[in-house]
Curated annotation (Swiss-Prot):
Expressed in female salivary gland. Not detected or low-level expression in female midgut and fat body. InterPro entries: C-type_lectin-like (IPR001304), C-type_lectin-like/link_sf (IPR016186), C-type_lectin/snaclec_domain (IPR050111), CTDL_fold (IPR016187). This is Salivary C-type lectin 1. It comes from Aedes albopictus. One of its GO terms (cellular component) is extracellular region.
């Protein structure tokens, strides 16, 4: 039993270390090899001296797109990544986590945000060429899990 516990801790620490190494780079943005819900993603970035990405300009959006296209794990048919926007405080008013600044620059998928079923409050980047989604934004349920983008502060 104790051996199993040590093994689980060792594996978890190895995963965390590998994920942290992906953020020990000179780039402004990083993509930890971690899957979390939106709050967990924000906490992970913060614990490691980063923040969930604030894509408040077209330039920052393009930087994330360019960097993401270089990540081997993202060379698939579908990628979804948390970013730091939500309307958790007030429905329909999207702000950047950590700053509280209103989202002004945006790159929503047509018809989004839609708050489907009344519980989509967190924003993710969505890349799925077969559906013509090219790193656009969508609102989704915050408790769903996916990888995410951290930004150096």
């Amino acid at each position: 039993m104790i051996f199993s516990l040590y093994l689980i801790v060792a594996i978890s620490l190895a995963d965390l270390t590998a994920a942290q190494q992906e953020c020990d780079c000179k780039n402004r943005f990083c993509f930890p090899n971690v899957v979390a819900n939106w709050i967990g993603a924000a906490e992970y970035c913060s614990r490691n001296g980063w923040r969930l990405a604030i894509l408040d300009t077209e330039e920052k959006q393009q930087q994330v797109e360019e960097q993401a296209q270089k990540v081997d794990a993202f060379k698939t048919n579908k990628v979804e990544l948390w970013i730091g926007a939500s309307d958790l405080a007030k429905e329909g008013k999207f702000v950047w986590h950590g700053t509280g600044i209103d989202v002004s620059y945006e790159k929503w998928i047509a018809g989004m945000p839609d708050n489907r079923n009344g519980n989509e409050h967190c924003v993710h980047l969505w890349y799925e060429p077969s559906r013509s989604f090219q790193w656009q934004w969508n609102d989704v349920v915050c408790s769903s899990t996916r990888r995410f983008v951290c930004e150096r502060m």
